C-alpha cells in the first residue's frame, strides 16, 4: 500500500506530502507482560512456597516441586524468564540452564513438570503467559487448555508441579506470582 498525506493550508489549497511506500502502517512496539530476567516464581496458594528444583539436581528430568525459600541465592529457586514473542516464554533454571518441560507424549492432567535440555523449539518448553488478578497463568503451547498447576492445590514441601486443565481465573493452584531476583 502507498499512502499520501494532504496538508490543507486554506479552504481552496491542498499540498501533497510525499511518503515512503510501506506495506503496513507503523505500529506501537509490542510490550511483553513479563520483562526478561531472573525471577522467583511463587504459588498464590501460599506465598512462602516457591517453584523449586528437587534436591538442587542439574540433571535432565529433575522434578519440579514447591519448597520454601531458604536463601535468596538458591539457584534451585531462581528462574530466567525469556520472552519469545506474543507473550510466549521459556522458563529456564538458573541452576542448570535447563527448561521447564513435560512429556509431550502425555499432554494430559497430572503430567509432572521436570527440567530438560533445550531441544528443537519443543512446545513443552514454551509457555503462554496470561495476566490475571494476583499473578499469571502459564499454559502450555502444546495445548492451551493445560496450565502449570500445583498438584491437589496443596502448597507444602515437595508438592509436585504438573499440567492440569485450566479451570478458573481465580484458581490459586494455577496462578503464579513473580518476584525479581537480584542473582
Predicted segments with their positions:
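Lectin-like carbohydrate-binding module/patch detector with strong preference for beta-trefoil
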Residues: 1-183
Amino acid at each position: 500500500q502507498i499512502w499520501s498525506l494532504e496538508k490543507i493550508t486554506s479552504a481552496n489549497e491542498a499540498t501533497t506530502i510525499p511518503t515512503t511506500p510501506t506495506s503496513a502502517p507503523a505500529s506501537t512496539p509490542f510490550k511483553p507482560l513479563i520483562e526478561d530476567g531472573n525471577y522467583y516464581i511463587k504459588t498464590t496458594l501460599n506465598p512462602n512456597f516457591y517453584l523449586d528444583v528437587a534436591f538442587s539436581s542439574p540433571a535432565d528430568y529433575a522434578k519440579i516441586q514447591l519448597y520454601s525459600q531458604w536463601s535468596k541465592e538458591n539457584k534451585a529457586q531462581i528462574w530466567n524468564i525469556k520472552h519469545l514473542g506474543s507473550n510466549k516464554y521459556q522458563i529456564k533454571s538458573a541452576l542448570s540452564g535447563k527448561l521447564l518441560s513435560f512429556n509431550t507424549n502425555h499432554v494430559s492432567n497430572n503430567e509432572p513438570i521436570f527440567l530438560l535440555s533445550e531441544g528443537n523449539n519443543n512446545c513443552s518448553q514454551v509457555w503462554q503467559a496470561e495476566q490475571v488478578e494476583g499473578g499469571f497463568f502459564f499454559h502450555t503451547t502444546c495445548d492451551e487448555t493445560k496450565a502449570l498447576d500445583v498438584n491437589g492445590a496443596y502448597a507444602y514441601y515437595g508438592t509436585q508441579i504438573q499440567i492440569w486443565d485450566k479451570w478458573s481465573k481465580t484458581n490459586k493452584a494455577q496462578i503464579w506470582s513473580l518476584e525479581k531476583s537480584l542473582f
